[in-house]
């Protein structure tokens, strides 16, 4: 862009970097920037390597080193896509399109696989135990927050990023349901937002009733753009606890530690569970109850069947179904 001399073109050129950055989700850009920074730090150790524009064979060597020192292919893939993104954003040829970088990344994926830290889904029975424990008649704000987080994550298939950014003005109640506006999600590339609908249930586990209880307990009673899930003040009298006044969404580390403690409290092994276990559990329950595939995919905001299918864990009956129905 240094070659641009015309004043009008210069003004447009100044708008180009932020426009290019906004083509990706903020979290993705942040990850790519961090990944490219690590590549630069590695390059600085060697006089012969330039990080931008980079040469394919040096990228391949970097990916190989990452592969040798990692237990998962994730760092290799992040480095690969970060370097690619940085070059394309700078208007340069993408050196990761060379055969060597691609071959090293593919070998790392084959060698290291997806890792062995996949979390198990939470069952509807386990969720019922959680609701019984944390949403009883004497529950305080902190306990109701846990119940609301668990139910919304399970019934609306929410990721942490979607859950944590829900504002009070994003939640609307109708007759027999509620709908929640998600300003953005992992698959919402163009950030247009999307409504997700959750039905009322004739059950103690009704997500609509419990979310309403939580919102009343938290003091929400008029239009506000405050986040509904925030930190909670400490008080020896648990019924005097309140949401913190600072409008900051609940952090990932807080949600994770809360959920692991909740899972432990109902007798589940927290080492095989995580924040994604609720979304995964809801998806698995929907699949086992033969929810129409199109609705299933839309409700979970998945781009592809492959992405969606990763969330579903078949039981033994389902695994045997195919071989039982071959006409033999």
Where would I find each of the regions flagged by the language model?
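Extended, non-catalytic subsegments within catalytic or DNA/protein-binding/adaptor domains
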Residues: 1-328
């Amino acid at each position: 862009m240094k070659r641009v001399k015309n004043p009008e073109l210069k003004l447009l050129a100044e708008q180009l970097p932020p426009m290019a950055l906004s083509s990706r989700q903020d979290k993705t850009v942040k990850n790519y920037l961090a990944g490219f920074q690590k590549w630069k730090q590695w390059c600085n150790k060697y006089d012969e390597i330039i990080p931008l524009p980079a040469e394919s064979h040096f990228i391949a060597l970097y990916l190989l080193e990452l592969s040798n020192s990692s237990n998962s292919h994730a760092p290799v893939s992040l480095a690969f896509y970060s370097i690619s993104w940085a070059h394309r954003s700078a208007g340069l040829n993408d050196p990761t399109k060379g055969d060597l970088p691609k071959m090293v990344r593919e070998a790392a994926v084959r060698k290291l696989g997806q890792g062995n830290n996949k979390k198990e889904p939470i069952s509807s029975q386990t969720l019922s135990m959680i609701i019984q424990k944390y949403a009883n008649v004497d529950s305080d704000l902190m306990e109701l927050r846990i119940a609301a987080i668990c139910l919304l994550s399970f019934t609306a298939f929410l990721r942490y990023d979607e859950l944590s950014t829900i504002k009070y003005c994003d939640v609307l109640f109708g007759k027999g349901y509620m709908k929640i506006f998600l300003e953005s999600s992992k698959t919402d590339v163009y950030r247009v937002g999307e409504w997700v609908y959750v039905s009322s249930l004739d059950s103690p586990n009704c997500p609509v009733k419990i979310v309403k209880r939580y919102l009343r307990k938290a003091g929400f009673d008029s239009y506000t753009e405050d986040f509904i899930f925030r930190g909670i003040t400490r008080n020896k009298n648990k019924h005097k606890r309140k949401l913190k006044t600072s409008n900051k969404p609940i952090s990932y580390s807080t949600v994770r530690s809360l959920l692991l403690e909740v899972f432990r409290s109902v007798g589940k092994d927290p080492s095989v569970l995580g924040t994604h276990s609720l979304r995964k559990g809801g998806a698995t329950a929907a699949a086992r109850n033969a929810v129409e595939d199109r609705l299933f995919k839309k409700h979970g905001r998945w781009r592809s069947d492959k992405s969606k299918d990763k969330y579903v864990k078949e039981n033994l009956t389902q695994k045997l179904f195919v071989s039982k129905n071959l006409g033999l």
